[in-house]
Amino acid sequence: MPAQKMAREFANRGWGMYRSKSSVRDYQAGDIMSSGGHVWMAVGQCDDGSAVILHASPPGVQLAGTPARNGRADSQAVALAQRYMKTYFPRWYEKYPNCAKDGNYLTQYAQMRWDITGRAVMTDPENYKEKSADEILADLFAQR
């Protein structure tokens, strides 16, 4: 399936709710973001409106961060992504230290948000939809 169709197709299958790129307002863990040629998944949102994301490119998979909503490149999400990549994936981080994505990641991607009510294919037993990116990463990497 082409990348730009993924968010809408997943929603059409009854797995969640679709939002066009102009309707995206926030990011929750698991949000599928799709545009022409690329798909990424949100890990969570930070207080400055930036998002920690998980994406794959030809070299491999990486945690990365978007700019803050105000356009500031040195966002909370970029700092979190750098910290986790450097700590848990040091060889990968040494080879690919840039964990910053551009503002297009916030404006040019449609969104599919999972239905976590139990009526579809997903639930949220950890209640990640209510947590910040920092809290989610700490839980995923067992920093309790």
Question: PLM features: residue spans?
Answer:
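...with weaker cross-activation on analogous glycine-rich loops/strands in unrelated enzymes
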Residues: 2-71
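Low-complexity, Gly/Ser/Thr/Pro-rich intrinsically disordered linker/tail segments
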Residues: 68-144
